[in-house]
Amino acid sequence: MMNRLIKSSLLVLMAGATLAANALAAGVGAPAPKVSREAVVVYYDNAEPCIEFSARELQKTLTTVGHKPVTLKALAEMPASPEACYVVIAKNTSQPVLRLLETRGGQKVGALGKEAYVLRRTDGGGKKGYWAIGGDRVGAMYGGVDIGEIAAAGSIADVVNGDHKPYVAKRGMKFNIPLDKRQPSFDDNGTSGRENFQHVWDLEFWKEYLDTIAKQRYNVLSLWNRHPFPTLVKVPGYEDVALDDVYDKDGKLIKKMTHAEKVAFWQKVMDYADDRGIEVWWYVWNIHVYGSEDTKHGLTDSPTNATTKDYIRKSVTQLFLTYPKLTGLGMCPGENFADKNKDHDFKEQWCWDVYGEGILDYKKLNPARKIGFVHRYWLTDFTYIGDRFKKLPDGYDLEYKYSKARLYSAPNPPFVKKDVLDVTPAGMKTWWNLRNDDIFLVRWGDPEYVKQAVLNFPGDGRTAGYVWGSDRFCWGRESASKNPTSPRQLENDKHWYSFLLWGRLGYDPETSPQLLKGLLKHRFHLADAGALYDSWQSASQIIPLVNRTRYVPWDFMWWVEGCRGNLLDKSIQGFHTVNIFLDERWGGMENSGIIGIPDYVSGKKTSGTTPLQVATQLDELAEKALKGISGINAGDNVGLRETLGDIRAQVRLGQYYAAKIRGTVALGLFRKTGKTEYQKDAIAHLKNALTAWRNYAKELDASYTNKLFISGQKTFDWFDDSGPQLDIAIAEQG
């Protein structure tokens, strides 16, 4: 049986290489011919910046797909007799618009909630009207964006009557922000963090970023930094703590700025976010005093330093006084409380004294303003939270690492019930922290996975929202492409498909696959995108399947793209060899139905999907993805060429893990039984794994700069195949 598996693995690798070689030679994916379409007039509420943004984006899209001219006009300019083709973007409070819609035969608009919208079409006397009516300014903006997507995916004539409302109320980005060498985020050491110090102080970056995430249906931007207060506020009595200028990770001055100019900068960012319907939150960890250690006040990270408590409490109050557009603050009762880290009662009292009282101080001055507060549910116990923080007049939510650090593992992770739902009150809302410390490089795209993840969020009012992001990566501008633009491409644009899925499907998990295929077709100028959609989905199932088979929960322990771990646990530092794969600590993901490698080898578990069956599934997914993209010709389309390369990279990684899983199982069985045929099989499989790894390296190297420094994982050199070679040596030694 094992010999058949070896032959099967070799055949898959050989077939994959042939398909890849032929992929760019095929001409099925030629660009679709441009179509000349009718003129369109877009009427919009020009008093609302986010609606104006939507109208201008729609103008760009309609022009791109061939409508000419596309003219923008204010609602007040709408004539009694309509043009041949027109669009209306407005709020449902505009009674003249609603009356005109009904006069022209449009379906009546009912009551609409926050961010909800309806699409309506009218066709009286051959005059085609397309209407986006929002329950508020943001809903109207989303309606206009939706019409643009429909037009891009096919034709504006595909717009149909429909009512839309957000499935998840708050859909956010988790942005670990490298403010300054003196003001670090959780981990700015990687290439992505280091390269983005300059960008986060560029207003044009934030405008492009906020425009992009608004179109992707995100309405929350959470900015995470260990101790941002010296940058953000000047606190009475502690004025000298405020920091001027900006320094990068190496201590190089990158921008001369007074503190007042910094405040003005962040006020502009928050104003712009508000104009795109996006809330801004700041998140902090405790206890940190970065940037303020050397002042005259004696500020330290000691839990018993009363001056530190006073400074941070007053910083919280000043934060809301300084930024009227700031929605809220999130905080973590860790991970730096020294000998008090496990004293939850002490920590929660400290956090209440600082953050709770700081907010109450502000509310005394401005009782009408609602202040959001999120208490991260990490290194604590709700027993010590509820009675304290329930005193906040505007309430508070919890936050929880929904999949630990493995967003790409299972869409229905099993942890939340026992960790949160069973130990907190029925009415307690929680934000789900969707931690992606799995995929930093390759473009991912599985709509069904995202849909099921969203539908599996707890109901009964327990979901406040979600934030999507990483601890070990900065999702600002990309820093690894061999084809860089100037300025460098946004990560949200490079990974536009996955960001769109996590945003748009959070708003509407029933988003049509046909619409998504149409958007792929438009993005990459394809005649048909069905093959790309299916192949991308197949390739994107590989990493989650690997993570379910070998579930290693935290970012520092395991990075699947590099097959490595680092930092806290020396036993799993560096490349993860077959010996580490056999470590009984890392079995199949709970409730996944998969038998982990150690349990399969030992015989502890016999019911479920075996590792060898997983290996077969990985090869099948790889073969399906390669076959699907074999007829797509990228031509000179760099984005499509890199996307196809990322699909092939995931394929090669899947083939690598398929062979490695087989080799690990065979080695484990050899050690258990002493049968030499298992050892021979292990060596053969691991040689196949080495071949697959080298193919993986070639795919990555076609698009990316090698030797990236990945936070928590050190330098990733994909041409360094000493790890896969070590696996072979381990098997040879037995």
Go through each PLM region and give its residues.
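Conserved, mostly hydrophobic/aromatic
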Residues: 62, 136, 213, 331, ...
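Feature activates predominantly on carbohydrate-active enzymes
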Residues: 57, 61, 105-307, 324-325, ...
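Catalytic-core regions of glycoside hydrolase
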Residues: 70, 75-79, 97, 176, ...
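C-terminal non-catalytic alpha-helical accessory regions
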Residues: 470-474, 484-712, 716
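Bacterial N-terminal signal peptides that target proteins for export
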Residues: 1-13
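Second-shell loop/turn segments in exported
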Residues: 41-51, 130-134, 195-199, 341-344
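Aromatic-lined, polymer-binding surfaces characteristic
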Residues: 285-309, 322-330, 334-337, 344-348, ...
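Acidic, contiguous N-terminal accessory segments
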Residues: 11-15, 23-123, 157
